[in-house]
Amino acid sequence: TVDEHLKVIEHTVKCVNGRIPVIAGSGSNSTAQAIETTTESQRIGADFSLLVTPYYNRPNQKGLIEHYIKIADECNINQILYNVPSRTGCDILPETVEILSKHQNIIGIKEAVNNQKRINELVEISKQSQEDFLIFSGDDESFFNLITSGGHGVISVAANVIPKSISDICKLIIEERIEEANEINKKYQNLYDLLFIESNPIPVKWILFKMGFIQNSLRLPLVNLDKKFEE
């Protein structure tokens, strides 16, 4: 429920206690709902909002521009666009990102499309931006390539399981120690694949259960990992 969603954000803010920034997922395929959740996330203490493209109703690029501009006008919090068309059926194109990047409250994008041409276009938008416009990967398999191509980081599924390693890879790339970063990254290619043997977040939650962090239970319509994958 929306109330539970906000309680998770509030709990996270309290646990973090200012040590690192909190990025709250507050997107919706309803602009009004996204504004409400983003406003509440800011009130609770989130530092950034992550706004997924509207799913199911699949607006065109004009609709996406108006959707995001309306949220950015109404909510005075740093906002990150989130593009994951494989899950939403909605793809925010680079030319649309370029328009949105000019709004002072829209400070970056989490891009889950694994495509070098797309990455290059977004990096170029970032370079041309008068303000810092940040490019984050939303795809563990290609995040190394995105950052070494000029991107800024990753919002990662695998980081739930190996947070230090993902952080180390990013730091090494920033320090231009690319070969060292690549050696670490190559060790986890199999893990990146395993995390998507079923729909995310089923595999990552099963691994966290096996690590002793959470219970082995999911809410419908998600179900536990198929036993044939447990080995």
Regions found by a protein language model. Give the residues of each.
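Tryptophan-rich aromatic "cage" segments
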Residues: L225-E231
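Catalytic alpha/beta core domains of metabolic enzymes, predominantly
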Residues: D73-E74, R87-F196
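A short acidic, helix-capping loop that chelates divalent metal ions and anchors anionic groups
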Residues: P54-N57, S165, N216-S217
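A general structural signal for well-ordered alpha-helical segments in protein cores
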Residues: H5, I9, A34, Y68, ...
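Conserved short secondary-structure transition element at the edge of the structured enzyme core
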Residues: I147-G151, Q189-L222
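Glycine-rich phosphate-binding "P-loop"
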Residues: N83, I106, R219-L220
